[in-house]
Amino acid sequence: AKIRMDDCVMCGHCTAVCPKNAVTISGYDTEQIEKKEKVRLNPSDVLDVIRFRRSIRRFQRKDVPSEVIGQILEAGRLTHTAKNMQDVSFVVLKKEITRIESMAVKLFKIIKPLADLFWPMARNTKIDDHFFFFHAPVVIVILAKEKTNGILAAQNMEFAAEANDLGVLFSGFFTTT
């Protein structure tokens, strides 16, 4: 076999699937791809998590430990992306939630009259001071060049949050540049 490093995107797939463990990538952390043991989720449990998922708009006012936030971010980081783009990044807001939400609410209150003209649903939308984050103790903003990649990461992150007994709200404000 000939190695073509110019075509390698350092995804680790070749190492993960080689039945003889003959392929290694210099400088690649194989811990990310080595299966320790076969782990299978109970299909009915997975379907129940999906079936009974509800958006949370009344969050408990309790701190989310850094380790839990780390697990949620790791679930997003490990998400597959189209063409191995790996274009997803995350911004965690804790202390700045109120300030950032306040700025966004001010902007939305300015543009709402225009939105009311073109978007019927906007007419029934009330914008209060906590319109975006609903007093959530932590906000994770997901950034991705390819919107689908961000959505996939958000879904995996929701599963990690659910596993930690946390509620999730997808704000639903997607933008493109």
Residue ranges and their predicted role:
Residues 1-177:
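Acidic, surface-exposed loops and disordered segments
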